[in-house]
C-alpha cells in the first residue's frame, strides 16, 4: 500500500526483554506493535529485520534493560540502526530503566564512564531522542546534545503507597546520594525520611 505524502505515521517497536510492557503502551495509544523479525545465530549474534516500511514514520523503540543487559542494549541499538537505514523520520529510544546508570562518573582512575558510552551508542546508532524513567542521576541527561526526556513515576508510587499503607510511614534512602529523591518522595507522602550511612 502506498501512503499519501505527508500522512503521519507512528510506529512502536519492542525489543525482546519486555514485549508485554510495549504492547500495553501501544494499546493505550490505540495502536499495535510493529512487526520485527528477531533471531539469534548460533554464535550469539542478533539478527533484526523490520517487517514493514517505516519511511517517514515517527518510530519509538522500547526495551527494558534488566537481566541480560548487554544483550538488550545491542538488540535495541540494532533496531534503532535498522530504522535509521530504512528512512524513519524520527527515532525515539525508550529505555524505562537506563542501563549502566550507576556508572555515571569515574570513582577511581582508569575507569570508563559507562552511562555516557551508552548514550553515545544510541545517538551514533541513529536515535533522535532518548526517553528514560527515574534516572539514577539527572546529569545523565547532559551526556548528549539531542533531546533526553527524564520522566518520573513518583506520582504513581505516591498514590499506590497512600492506598496501601496507613500512616505514619518512613521513606529510607539506601545511601546519601538518594536523600534528595527520598526527601521529595516523603514530602509528597507526608512521611518521615531517613537514610543509611555507608562506611
Where in this protein do the model-derived segments appear?
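PRPP-associated nucleotide enzymes
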Residues: 1-199
Amino acid at each position: 500500500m502506498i501512503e499519501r505524502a505527508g500522512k503521519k505515521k507512528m510506529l512502536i517497536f519492542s525489543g525482546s526483554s519486555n514485549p508485554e510492557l510495549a504492547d500495553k503502551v501501544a494499546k493505550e495509544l490505540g495502536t499495535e506493535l510493529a512487526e520485527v523479525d528477531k533471531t539469534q545465530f548460533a554464535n550469539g549474534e542478533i539478527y533484526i529485520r523490520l517487517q514493514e516500511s517505516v519511511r517517514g514514520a515517527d518510530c519509538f523503540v522500547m526495551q527494558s534493560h534488566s537481566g541480560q543487559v548487554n544483550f538488550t542494549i545491542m538488540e535495541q541499538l540494532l533496531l534503532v540502526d535498522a530504522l535509521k537505514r530504512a528512512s524513519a523520520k524520527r527515532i525515539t529510544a525508550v529505555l524505562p530503566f537506563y542501563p549502566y546508570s550507576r556508572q555515571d562518573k569515574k570513582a577511581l582512575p582508569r575507569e570508563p564512564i559507562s552511562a555516557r558510552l551508552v548514550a553515545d551508542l544510541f545517538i551514533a546508532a541513529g536515535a533522535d531522542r532518548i526517553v528514560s524513567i527515574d534516572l539514577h542521576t539527572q546529569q545523565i541527561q547532559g551526556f548528549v546534545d539531542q533531546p533526553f526526556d527524564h520522566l518520573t513515576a513518583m506520582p504513581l508510587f505516591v498514590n499506590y503507597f497512600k492506598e496501601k499503607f496507613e500512616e505514619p510511614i518512613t521513606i529510607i534512602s539506601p545511601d546519601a546520594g538518594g536523600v534528595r529523591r527520598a526527601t521529595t518522595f516523603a514530602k509528597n507522602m507526608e512521611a518521615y525520611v531517613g537514610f543509611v550511612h555507608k562506611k
